[in-house]
Amino acid sequence: MSYISMKQLLEAGVHFGHETKRWNPKFKKFIFAERNGIFIIDLQKTLKQVDRSFDYIKDLAERGGVILFVGTKKQAQEIVELEARRTGMPYVTSRWLGGMLTNFKTMRTRIDRLNELDDLFESERINDRPKAERIQLASERERLLRFVGGIRKMNRLPDAIFVVDPTKEVIAVQEANKLGIPVIALADTDSDPDVIDYIVPGNDDAIRSIQLITHRVGDLLVEARGGHEDVSAGPVEEQSDEAQAAEQGTEGDTAQLTSSQGRS
């Protein structure tokens, strides 16, 4: 039994790729057709890659491995953070700072600085500082929290990274490749499959698609530790009305493609 059904993929719009003018020729093997200037991803191949990728994630999770979640595009940020927090995994949802992996020792010094500032603000010692300095330190703390707060508990390099949109997160992918860290990615038609170890070919722009794949990755990690979630994080929220409206136009195409892809 597959981790995700064809029906789920279709309903989430996972099959909708980019415009035909925005593509990577290396991705051709995962393309089913072209409709009205949009590439349609072959969901039969997506299902096969889901099984391969999720088998790896399940095995890694059962061995206690650490997966770094990466998703800095607007529509992925909240989903990626919630799933990472739910599973107790590190995450990056703001700008990827160069050297997060390849210069991890230096990155740890920034995390140490964040912890130092947290201690200062959580005690009454901050009140001993002049007002101008308090404002400056608060700004520094906020900036560090935004950029490295999600990896503050990552005491070593991750065993793998899970990326939403590897084309946007090119620096993260390059650093992982350089260090031999496996890359798992939800990758659209503009992606280069050659730099991804475990690819899930699919729509990396639509919220429903991102949520389906990322939430299922989270489920695998939770299941691997006996169904225990990180109590510090809430469930994945439903997408906003605006997001639903933006995707309503895809529903008719989904219905038309259900039979053709389901039988292919």
UniProtKB/Swiss-Prot annotation:
Family: Belongs to the universal ribosomal protein uS2 family.
NCBIfam families, per database record: rpsB_bact
Spans annotated as Disordered: 228-264
Keyword check for Ion transport: no
HAMAP family tied to this protein: Ribosomal_uS2_B
Gene Ontology biological process terms from the UniProt entry: translation
InterPro entries linked: Ribosomal_uS2, Ribosomal_uS2_bac/mit/plastid, Ribosomal_uS2_CS, Ribosomal_uS2_flav_dom_sf
Keyword Ribosomal protein belongs to the record: yes
GO molecular function, one term: structural constituent of ribosome
Keywords, in A-Z order: Ribonucleoprotein, Ribosomal protein
Biased composition (Polar residues): 251-264
Gene name, Swiss-Prot/TrEMBL: rpsB
Protein name: Small ribosomal subunit protein uS2
Source organism, top-level taxon: Bacteria
GO cellular component: cytosolic small ribosomal subunit
S-S bonds: none
Species the sequence originates in: Deinococcus radiodurans (strain ATCC 13939 / DSM 20539 / JCM 16871 / CCUG 27074 / LMG 4051 / NBRC 15346 / NCIMB 9279 / VKM B-1422 / R1)
